[in-house]
Amino acid sequence: MKEENSQAHYLALCRELEDHDYSYYVLHRPRISDYEYDMKLRKLLEIERSHPEWKVLWSPSTRLGDRPSGTFSVVSHKEPMLSIANSYSKEELSEFFSRVEKSLGTSPRYTVELKIDGIAVAIRYEDRVLVQALSRGNGKQGEDITSNIRTIRSLPLRLPEDAPEFIEVRGEVFFSYSTFQIINEKQQQLEKTIFANPRNAAGGTLKLLSPQEVAKRKLEISIYNLIAPGDNDSHYENLQRCLEWGFPVSGKPRLCSTPEEVISVLKTIETERASLPMEIDGAVIKVDSLASQRVLGATGKHYRWALAYKYAPEEAETLLEDILVQVGRTGVLTPVAKLTPVLLSGSLVSRASLYNEDEIHRKDIRIGDTVCVAKGGEVIPKVVRVCREKRPEGSEVWNMPEFCPVCHSHVVREEDRVSVRCVNPECVAGAIEKIRFFVGRGALNIDHLGVKVITKLFELGLVHTCADLFQLTTEDLMQIPGIRERSARNILESIEQAKHVDLDRFLVALGIPLIGIGVATVLAGHFETLDRVISATFEELLSLEGIGEKVAHAIAEYFSDSTHLNEIKKMQDLGVCISPYHKSGSTCFGKAFVITGTLEGMSRLDAETAIRNCGGKVGSSVSKQTDYVVMGNNPGSKLEKARKLGVSILDQEAFTNLIHLE
């Protein structure tokens, strides 16, 4: 056997490519050209095809991705992967330091690290070889994503001899800004949905069943924790050991002796934030001593020895290219800013809300302006201000069009309201938006019916009203390009499931002006059946808590229209069953909740629905009548007001316990 085809040569080639991967992806100092690397990798693959029995678990070829798997198995974590509590002010930082020092009886050292906005994973090595990788999941169990994690070039598949035989590392999987932009450009070329931000892109990529597709996207990872045998007592030193063993650790963790030093480092990281190649939303502070960490322990959800300090939302300048006008389900015209795409708080922003014509005039926003864009609560893009010094000559004041941009009917400005409305009952845009709302998550929650499918159903003349959805057939749906029999059956199955709906959800789905889930719950709780809601008088409606004259008038007017009543009857004739409302005996019944910030693993809508299912009420502002304020990430001014009024504040763990979500 030739030397170059021996098993010894194969192993040497594996080690050589392993070294080149480390130089290129971790040190960012390539030692050979891409062509030379590809030739060596091609030789490795040839040897493995000829001698499959020689292939080792840590072969660089495993980074290319295995065959697609059918699904991900669920595996229990060796140790729970808990969350880290968030803080947003120096006062909360001070409280954390005081709490730690009081519990330990001394002032400990702290490690400060970047809080990368990615996807947490746990990676296990046996005999110094990567054998398993799990997603965080619910903290107790995660999905086995080993094949996808192997594709990360900066992650070692095998550890050096001075590393322990058995270890687990935990890290954050992410995309750099540059890679994220490339991925979205490819998504656009393929006419697929673009990702809102790098975190969503990373999460979606790890969910792909084809590791070969994952490998093409070039995920990255940063290690933030090591679980290993031995007597080392320093988290900071553990991170240094990880670096020595070839793991990527982003941002040079800092070891601090005092709280004052921690605060200084936090300021430094904030100034460096804009120059980082990846998205961070804060920094993580950890008690450095592992023994002290064990003493401090954890709550059911958070570690008591760590805190995430969140920075203020970012702002970005960009060009306002145009002001588009959208028509909503009730005919209201809404102006939307079309922006030159800009990366903001990890999201690629190309649209921003302008609310209404009065708001545009108040801020003097014009087409061609350079504007400053921010995210309200780091979620909804909005135009904060105009950079008037950059305004081009000849710019004009913008006014709402006099005609609907879709049906070209005259629009009207309603008395005492800022809204401009298309009142043409035949306007296709309003009808499509009404159906889109009807099937949406806050209403009947019918899967697989997006705006493109609904629009195509309209164009084909298959749907004109919400009731028409319940008489669609497989043959109807298969007329839409791209929908085959299996997809059609999935849509029909979702529609069939939606035929059994609670009264409050059905009232929301109807799209009655001014009626959201809060008012719908009040109506359902008082009248209990749809027939009684329909027959309610204006005076009866007005007597209910939280319903004023305008809302009562909107409800009465809606149900006095025979067109609406006929559509409801048609739905019932087609099998829609509206369940009567039954009051809950929950301890939350009648309690008033206000939510501030973003909840982890739970949308605002899910949280509000859970509260209402327990008989609670959801408010939009804090007052003396508020019983609980639920605090998520990035809470707003509602939190401070709750503290001043002495309202009970629930973190997410207390909230889920109260409403029995877990």
Curated annotation (Swiss-Prot):
Zn(2+) binds at C404, C407, C422, C427. The keyword Metal-binding applies. Keywords: DNA damage, DNA repair, DNA replication, Ligase, Magnesium, Manganese, Metal-binding, NAD, Zinc. It catalyses: NAD(+) + (deoxyribonucleotide)n-3'-hydroxyl + 5'-phospho-(deoxyribonucleotide)m = (deoxyribonucleotide)n+m + AMP + beta-nicotinamide D-nucleotide. Residues 583-662 form the BRCT domain. GO terms for molecular function: DNA binding; DNA ligase (NAD+) activity; metal ion binding. GO terms for biological process: DNA repair; DNA replication. SMART domains: BRCT (SM00292), HhH1 (SM00278), LIGANc (SM00532). NAD(+) binds at D34, Y35, E36, Y37, D38, S83, I84, E113, R136, E172, K286, K310. Its cofactor is Mg(2+); Mn(2+). DNA ligase that catalyzes the formation of phosphodiester linkages between 5'-phosphoryl and 3'-hydroxyl groups in double-stranded DNA using NAD as a coenzyme and as the energy source for the reaction. It is essential for DNA replication and repair of damaged DNA. PANTHER family: CHROMOSOME TRANSMISSION FIDELITY FACTOR 18 (PTHR23389), DNA LIGASE (PTHR23389:SF9). NCBIfam families: dnlj, PRK07956.1. This is DNA ligase. It comes from Chlamydia pneumoniae (Chlamydophila pneumoniae). The lineage of its organism: Bacteria, Pseudomonadati, Chlamydiota, Chlamydiia, Chlamydiales.
